[in-house]
Amino acid sequence: VLIIAVLFLTACQLTTAETYSRGRQKHRARRSTDKNSKWTRECTHSGGACNSHDQCCNAFCDTATRTCV
């Protein structure tokens, strides 16, 4: 009877651990998606306002006129 009780408790712990890790994996995937969406941004086309080169689609900002060239 003692052996059966130990096996039952072990099985319960394994099932709980598996369920817990699945829940964490869902959250981990969701966080990864959120991070990727933060990195995705639109660029400013030629003639649009800019402050630095990284804002322009063609990667060149005329700082004198503050427009993408």
From Swiss-Prot:
Q: Which gene encodes it?
A: E1
Per the record, the similarity remark reads: Belongs to the conotoxin O1 superfamily.
Write out the entry's keywords from A to Z.
Disulfide bond, Knottin, Secreted, Signal, Toxin
Tissue occurrence: Expressed by the venom duct.
Q: Which residues belong to the propeptide?
A: 18-41
Q: Name one GO molecular function term.
A: toxin activity
Identification of the protein by name = Conotoxin Eb6.1
Q: Where in the cell is it found?
A: Secreted
Question: What InterPro entries does the database record attribute to this sequence?
Answer: Conotoxin
What start and end residues bound the annotated signal peptide? 1-17
- Give the source's domain of life in one word: Eukaryota
Instruction: Please give the chief subcellular localization of this protein.
Output: secreted
Has the keyword Signal been applied to this entry? yes
What do the Gene Ontology cellular component annotations say? extracellular region
Entry's free-text remark on domains: The presence of a 'disulfide through disulfide knot' structurally defines this protein as a knottin. The cysteine framework is VI/VII (C-C-CC-C-C).
Q: Which organism is it from?
A: Conus ebraeus
List the cysteine pairs that form cystine.
43-57, 50-61, 56-68
* Additional detail: This precursor corresponds to allele E1a. Has not been merged with other alleles since they may differ due to geographic variation (see strains in PubMed:19606224).
